[in-house]
């Protein structure tokens, strides 16, 4: 019987102590990507990781590649547009064939929310969910938490802080994973979106971005996921931006007397999700999130493959 391995399919797969461990390790790597011990590099140098992405990605796939290489592992990224999946091979058969080659870990992204949970049934190597439908994106939530942890100084300081998610919350796996994780850590949450972009949850909601800004210590803007909409919700993205863009004017009017930070998981629609001037503002932590993506994914890979 092979040794049972750990998967990371959703943030609830991790205990609070394990989350603290990941934050500690990722903080070291965020300060210095080269702070990988010789012991870790020696153990990782023969590890082979496969990235199996059935949806497009820039930040996630690149940061997993860089994280793997910085740890000393080898990574194979499959181009699913030129794979046998384009010839009609099923997801399960594609996965089983890759798994038969005995990689040490598989990172997967798929449009179906259930995909990683189904694939985990066939895997005795660590499986990492890099985004599944609208349900989960655990490493994004962890890197966002790392960004908040760095800014506020500790998990204890995060308790009671208020975060507003602004945008297409209903179709955002990032929001879904973040909400579940941040609720565990004692943050207050508000969702801000038009009715058609709000999920059915027992959380504070508003259709008014000004109310969200006044409520929050942290704003997380989300892009409109038009690829998941059955019909247009606004006449144009510009019309959406007029109602929900985080602008200097709105921040000046509704967050003038408090410290507030702004996050976005990317890709950002400039001047639709967040005004360009705000993205360049010191309150924007968007590029810190990107950097922290490498650090946190280094910590996750080390945790799953070596611990």
Swiss-Prot record:
Gene Ontology MF terms in the entry: amino acid binding; aspartate carbamoyltransferase activity
Sequence similarity: Belongs to the aspartate/ornithine carbamoyltransferase superfamily. ATCase family.
Keywords from the UniProt entry: Pyrimidine biosynthesis, Transferase
Chain residues that bind L-aspartate: 87, 173, 223
Coiled-coil annotated residue ranges, if any: none
Pathway(s) served: Pyrimidine metabolism; UMP biosynthesis via de novo pathway; (S)-dihydroorotate from bicarbonate: step 2/3
NCBIfam families per the UniProt record, alphabetical: asp_carb_tr, PRK00856.1
GO biological process: 'de novo' pyrimidine nucleobase biosynthetic process; 'de novo' UMP biosynthetic process; amino acid metabolic process
Record field: catalytic activity: carbamoyl phosphate + L-aspartate = N-carbamoyl-L-aspartate + phosphate + H(+)
Gene Ontology, cellular component aspect: cytosol
InterPro entries: Asp/Orn_carbamoyltranf_P-bd, Asp/Orn_carbamoylTrfase, Asp/Orn_carbamoylTrfase_sf, Asp_carbamoyltransf, Asp_carbamoyltransf_Asp/Orn-bd
Name listed for the protein in its UniProt record: Aspartate carbamoyltransferase catalytic subunit
Matches recorded under HAMAP family: Asp_carb_tr (MF_00001)
PROSITE patterns listed in its UniProt record: CARBAMOYLTRANSFERASE
EC number(s) on file: 2.1.3.2
The gene coding this protein: pyrB
Function in brief: Catalyzes the condensation of carbamoyl phosphate and aspartate to form carbamoyl aspartate and inorganic phosphate, the committed step in the de novo pyrimidine nucleotide biosynthesis pathway.
Subunit structure of this chain's protein: Heterododecamer (2C3:3R2) of six catalytic PyrB chains organized as two trimers (C3), and six regulatory PyrI chains organized as three dimers (R2).
């Amino acid at each position: 019987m092979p040794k049972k391995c750990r998967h990371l399919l959703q943030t609830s797969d991790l205990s609070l102590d394990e989350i603290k461990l990941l934050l500690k390790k990722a903080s070291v790597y965020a300060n210095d990507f080269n702070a990988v011990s010789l012991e870790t590099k020696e153990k990782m140098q023969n590890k082979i990781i496969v990235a199996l992405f059935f949806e497009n990605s820039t930040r996630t796939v690149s940061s997993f590649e860089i994280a793997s290489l910085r740890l000393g592992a080898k990574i194979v990224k499959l181009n699913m547009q030129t794979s046998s999946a384009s010839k009609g091979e099923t997801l399960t058969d594609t996965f089983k064939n890759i798994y038969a080659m005995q990689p040490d870990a598989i990172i997967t992204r798929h449009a179906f929310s259930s995909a990683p949970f189904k694939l985990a049934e066939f895997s005795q190597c660590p499986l990492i969910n890099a985004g599944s439908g609208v349900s989960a994106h655990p490493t994004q939530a962890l890197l966002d938490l790392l960004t908040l942890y760095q800014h506020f100084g500790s998990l204890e300081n995060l308790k009671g802080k208020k975060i507003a998610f602004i945008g297409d919350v209903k179709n955002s796996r990032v929001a879904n994973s973040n909400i579940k994780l941040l609720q565990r850590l004692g943050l207050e949450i508000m969702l801000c979106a038009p009715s058609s972009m709000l999920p059915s949850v027992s959380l504070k909601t508003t259709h008014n971005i000004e109310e969200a800004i006044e409520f929050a210590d942290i704003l997380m803007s989300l892009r409109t996921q038009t690829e998941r909409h059955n019909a247009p919700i606004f006449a144009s993205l510009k019309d959406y931006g007029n109602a929900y863009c985080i602008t200097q004017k709105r921040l000046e009017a509704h967050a003038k007397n408090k410290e507030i930070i702004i996050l976005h998981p990317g890709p950002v629609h400039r001047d639709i999700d967040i005004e360009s001037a705000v993205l360049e503002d010191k309150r924007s932590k968007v590029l810190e999130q990107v950097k922290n993506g490498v650090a946190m994914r280094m910590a996750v890979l080390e945790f799953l493959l070596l611990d």
